[in-house]
């Protein structure tokens, strides 16, 4: 019986000529006359056992492909040109892609020009980008490859600070390509992260390119009242859809977003004060009642920082309280802070670096009702007085922007709205031009390079130029409005000394 001899890494395989002749594959057609010669056909780049598996497939139309042998069989099938086996191997690899092997499969697909595997592995990287940064192969991605990944509209990052941490980890392995940092959009980053990058000696150029990462764009949550039942809706920039999350029957509550959950704090139900806090996951729409606060109260002030929800002051029946406490997301124990110097409700609270600032509101007892202008700062585990606001205000809204505080006041006893800037380093207040007037309740949040105000219409205030934009928007019956990103960078004063600790904390929070 005539045979064709193959040599693979010094090992010999003799194959019946009839198998070669009957094969429909081009590789075997080209060597059908080679058996007339005495020398063996040398096959390079093919595993001996993989070639045996291909011969079994050619003879019996059966092949044993596992996750352990799929790559070597696929390489052999590509070189020998056996398309059915190539397809089987590619399907096996795609079925077994995960965050720990997707970069290796991505590189494999490029090496052998396998488009389906390339697309599948790229999709896995895009969906699990924060996890794949732990892969030793991550640092070997080229600059162009990482740029393509991070520029994809569906790349799974929820904040531009996360993108920054991904880039910093890659730059650590590729110090000659620091200019990749220019794919960042600084207006979507926190001041803290921008300062950290500056301390590293990196400069982000002003980008005129459109924002492609949908995940870094602001989510929106709205609570709208109708017949004493308020409906909660959520807008996702990744899906571009509004979805109804649920309902609440509370009044005089406060709300805040932390780790993609909406917390509804205190308030009243059927004219009765409550001390419960409800939490709804904005993705799963699942509700949970978290541990009660220390007392029954409404009209509290809230702020969030570093994974913690802070609740300050409030109204306990008819008396203002100075209680300050916080709850870490995912835990069940409220931690008490020292009480405010002046109890109050309806004030504003905001973080600047590691410090809490509380301002305005109302101090009330059974005998007194005092509208406040004083400002307190919680720093180094104690409250201290700061320069008071220029006027007394019972309704105050405050946001941090570029290390300072911007305050917009509502009206009750006041005759008009005011806009102030508090310069933190100078402990100084200045009054700025106010675009609108005679608005009581509103919602204020910082959105990159502008401050968004939802009042009788939608306003954008640009602090750097002290200019305003006005947009038509129906604001009727809105009880709460907030724009947010899904991850919260720790707010702290980053210095050269604290920079390593800050970056380490961010890496643990964002990339693990």
Curated annotation (Swiss-Prot):
Q: Which PROSITE patterns match?
A: BTB
Has the keyword Repeat been applied to this entry? yes
Determine the domain of life of the protein's source. Viruses
Q: Where is the BTB domain?
A: 2-67
Which SMART domains would you find in this protein's record?
Answer: BACK (SM00875), BTB (SM00225), Kelch (SM00612)
Repeat (Kelch) residue spans along the chain: 216-261, 262-307, 309-354, 356-403, 405-449, 452-498
Q: Which UniProt keywords apply?
A: Early protein, Kelch repeat, Repeat
- Which family, according to the similarity comment? Belongs to the poxviruses Kelch family.
- Which protein is depicted? Kelch repeat protein C2
Q: Which organism is it from?
A: Vaccinia virus (strain Tian Tan)
**What taxonomic lineage is listed for the species of origin?**
Viruses, Varidnaviria, Bamfordvirae, Nucleocytoviricota, Pokkesviricetes
């Amino acid at each position: 019986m005539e045979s064709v001899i193959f040599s693979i890494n010094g090992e010999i395989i003799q194959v019946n000529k009839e198998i070669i002749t009957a094969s429909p594959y081009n590789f075997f057609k080209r060597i059908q006359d080679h058996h007339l010669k005495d020398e063996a056909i040398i096959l390079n780049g093919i595993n001996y056992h993989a070639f045996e598996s291909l011969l079994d497939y050619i003879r019996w139309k059966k092949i044993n492909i596992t996750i352990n042998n799929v790559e070597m069989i696929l390489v052999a099938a590509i070189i020998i040109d056996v398309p059915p086996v190539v397809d089987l191997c590619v399907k096996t690899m795609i079925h077994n892609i995960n965050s720990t092997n997707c970069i290796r499969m991505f590189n494999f697909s490029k090496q052998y020009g396998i488009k389906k595997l390339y697309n599948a592995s790229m999709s896995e990287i895009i969906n699990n980008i924060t996890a794949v940064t732990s892969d030793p192969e991550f640092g070997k991605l080229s600059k162009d490859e990482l740029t393509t990944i991070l520029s994809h509209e569906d790349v799974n990052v929820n904040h531009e600070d996360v993108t920054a941490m991904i880039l910093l980890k890659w730059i650590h392995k590729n110090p000659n390509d620091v200019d990749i940092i220019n794919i960042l959009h600084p207006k979507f980053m926190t001041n803290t992260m921008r300062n950290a990058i500056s301390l590293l000696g990196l400069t982000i150029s002003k980008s005129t390119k459109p924002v492609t990462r949908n995940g870094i764009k602001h989510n929106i949550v709205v609570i709208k009242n109708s017949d004493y039942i308020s409906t909660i809706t959520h807008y996702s920039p990744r899906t571009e859809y509004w979805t109804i999350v649920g309902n609440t029957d509370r009044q005089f509550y406060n709300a805040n977003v932390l780790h993609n959950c909406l917390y509804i704090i205190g308030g009243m139900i059927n004219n009765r004060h409550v001390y419960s806090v409800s939490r709804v996951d904005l993705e799963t729409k699942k509700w949970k009642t978290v541990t009660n606060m220390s007392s029954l109260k409404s009209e509290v002030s809230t702020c969030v920082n570093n994974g913690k929800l802070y609740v300050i002051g409030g109204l306990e029946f008819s008396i203002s309280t100075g209680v300050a406490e916080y709850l870490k997301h995912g835990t069940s124990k409220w931690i008490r802070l020292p009480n405010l110097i002046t109890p109050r409700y309806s004030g504003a609270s905001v973080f600047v670096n590691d410090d809490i600032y509380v301002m305005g509101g109302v101090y009330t007892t059974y005998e007194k009702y005092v509208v406040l202008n004083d400002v307190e700062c919680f720093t180094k585990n104690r409250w201290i007085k700061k320069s008071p606001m220029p006027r007394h205000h019972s309704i105050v809204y405050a946001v941090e922007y570029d290390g300072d505080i911007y305050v917009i006041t509502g009206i009750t006893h006041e005759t008009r709205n005011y806009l102030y800037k508090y310069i933190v380093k100078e402990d100084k207040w200045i009054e700025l031009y106010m675009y609108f007037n005679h608005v009581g309740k509103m919602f204020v949040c910082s959105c990159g390079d502008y401050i968004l105000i939802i009042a009788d219409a939608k306003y954008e205030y640009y602090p750097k130029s002290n200019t305003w934009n006005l947009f038509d928007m129906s604001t009727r019956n809105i009880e709460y409005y907030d724009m947010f990103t899904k991850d919260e960078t720790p707010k702290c004063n980053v210095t050269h000394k604290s920079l390593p600790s800050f970056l380490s904390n961010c890496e643990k929070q964002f990339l693990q």
